[in-house]
């Protein structure tokens, strides 16, 4: 999607990234989801009441959705925990179900849509400022936005 915007094939693109920074592109943040741990209630880490330190995941198989794999490998790798990723799933629900079935932990970008899939689980924040993913609209800096493009971004509230 980024090459399409850079090459003027598309005017606006929506991407999900932890820290989107593109030199030739202007970014307009749209949504931000915190990345959290989803833990079965019987798991030892479910009893914690404070954010979980990344080191506490050491030795625990983790399930993560693909869209946060780069973020997890980067942040967890600094703490030698990245190799604990046991499965990369296509969607949050699959990671949650995997954690539920195998009594382990899913690391997911949590949104309101995930609430119904986690009623029997414990949601815990992760103690690291880089544990989030954003949806951002990308626009080429050198390109003037069309009337329709401006209207769209204004309508959804990312352009004032």
Language-model region placement:
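Secondary-structure junction motif
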Residues: 58-81, 145-149, 153
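Flexible hinge/capping segments at coil-to-helix
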Residues: 24-35, 39-62
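Ligand-binding clamshell of periplasmic/extracellular solute-binding protein-like
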Residues: 2-3, 17-26, 45
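Hydrophobic hinge/microswitch elements
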Residues: 1-9, 16, 68-124
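Ligand-binding "clamshell"
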Residues: 21-33, 115-126, 133
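Residues embedded in well-ordered beta-strands
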Residues: 36-38, 44, 105, 134-138
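A late-sequence structural motif
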Residues: 123-160
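Short helix-loop capping/hinge motifs at secondary-structure junctions, enriched
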Residues: 42-52, 70, 128-131, 142-148
């Amino acid at each position: 999607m980024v090459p399409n915007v850079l090459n003027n094939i598309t005017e606006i693109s929506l991407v999900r990234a932890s820290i989107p920074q593109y030199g030739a592109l202007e970014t307009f943040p749209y949504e931000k989801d915190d990345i959290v741990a989803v833990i079965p209630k019987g798991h030892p880490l479910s009893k914690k009441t404070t954010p979980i330190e990344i080191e506490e995941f050491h030795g625990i198989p983790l399930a993560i959705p693909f869209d946060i794999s780069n973020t997890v490998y980067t942040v967890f790798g600094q703490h030698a925990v990245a190799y604990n990723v046991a499965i990369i799933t296509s969607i949050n629900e699959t990671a949650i179900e995997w954690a539920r079935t195998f009594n382990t932990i899913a690391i997911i970008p949590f949104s309101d849509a995930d609430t119904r899939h986690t009623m029997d689980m414990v949601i815990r924040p992760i103690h690291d400022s880089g544990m989030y993913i954003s949806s951002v609209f990308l626009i080429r800096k050198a390109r003037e936005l069309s009337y329709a493009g401006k209207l769209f971004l204004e309508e959804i509230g990312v352009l004032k």
